[in-house]
C-alpha cells in the first residue's frame, strides 16, 4: 500500500478511486490532483512510480485533509454553538440544522423513539 497524507491507499484500485480514501478528497478533487500531477486516472496505484507518488503527495499536502480538516469542521460547529446562532442551537439539541421538518422524520439526528405512555380512559 502506498501512503499519501498519512493514509494507506489500496494498491489494486485505480488512483482516482484510491485518493478518495483520504478524508477531504472526493472524486472531483482527486481528478484535479491527478491532472495537476500529470498522472492518468486509469493507472493502478501499484503501477505508480516513486516520482509520480511524490508529485501526488506534494499536491495533496497543499490541501486541508484528514485531521486538520476534521479539526476545522469541529471548531466551526463549536463556534456556532458558542455564539448561540440558530444552527448552533440545533447542533446542541441534536436536531437537523438545514431546515428539514422534524414532526415525523429526522430519526437519524433525534435518535430512537422515546415513547410517551397513553392516558388511561
UniProtKB/Swiss-Prot annotation:
Coiled coil residues, start to end: none
Segments crossing the lipid bilayer: none
Domain of life: Bacteria
Extent of the signal sequence: none
Keyword field: Ribonucleoprotein, Ribosomal protein, RNA-binding, rRNA-binding, tRNA-binding
GO molecular function, one term: rRNA binding
Biological process annotations from GO: translation
A single cellular component GO annotation: cytosol
Biased composition (Basic residues): 106-121
Region spans: Disordered: 91-121
Family per record: Belongs to the universal ribosomal protein uS13 family.
Function statement: Located at the top of the head of the 30S subunit, it contacts several helices of the 16S rRNA. In the 70S ribosome it contacts the 23S rRNA (bridge B1a) and protein L5 of the 50S subunit (bridge B1b), connecting the 2 subunits; these bridges are implicated in subunit movement. Contacts the tRNAs in the A and P-sites.
Subunit: Part of the 30S ribosomal subunit. Forms a loose heterodimer with protein S19. Forms two bridges to the 50S subunit in the 70S ribosome.
HAMAP family reported for this sequence: Ribosomal_uS13
The name this protein goes by in its record: Small ribosomal subunit protein uS13
Biological classification of the source: Bacteria, Bacillati, Bacillota, Bacilli, Bacillales
